[in-house]
């Protein structure tokens, strides 16, 4: 993802950033978070805890500012998202936060919606003969 594409994604409304996340993660099999001594955790406007996720390292890196200064992008694969991260954050009462930007919270879908949307995109890719690019 080049700088102009990153800039374009940052300027999209939350829903379109979410749709971009679903497409990109299903296409690449990669998900990114920010880590320092532990994973970056945010909050919604009403105080709910959020685990922010990004579809690229460049988008994650842009958010390594303010309270997340010193955090670095860390990749994990789609299988880890399905098998480990989503079940763990759901059990902990933490929402997934999709493609935060330096200036705006990301969309916070339910765990079930995020899983269903990613699985639907993966099925769509499989039916067209495409596998995630590693």
Predicted segments, located by residue:
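Conserved NAD+-utilizing ADP-ribose enzyme module
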Residues: 1-134
């Amino acid at each position: 993802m080049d700088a102009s594409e990153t800039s374009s994604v940052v300027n999209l409304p939350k829903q379109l950033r979410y749709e971009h996340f679903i497409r990109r993660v299903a296409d690449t099999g990669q998900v990114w978070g920010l880590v320092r001594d532990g994973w970056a955790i945010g909050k919604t406007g009403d105080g709910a805890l959020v685990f922010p996720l990004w579809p690229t390292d460049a988008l994650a890196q842009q958010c390594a500012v303010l309270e997340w200064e010193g955090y670095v992008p860390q990749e994990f694969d789609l299988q880890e998202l399905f098998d480990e991260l989503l079940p763990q954050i759901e059990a902990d009462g933490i929402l997934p936060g999709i493609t935060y930007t330096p200036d705006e919270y990301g969309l916070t879908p339910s765990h079930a919606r995020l899983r269903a949307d990613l699985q639907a995109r993966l099925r769509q890719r499989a039916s067209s003969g495409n596998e995630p690019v590693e």
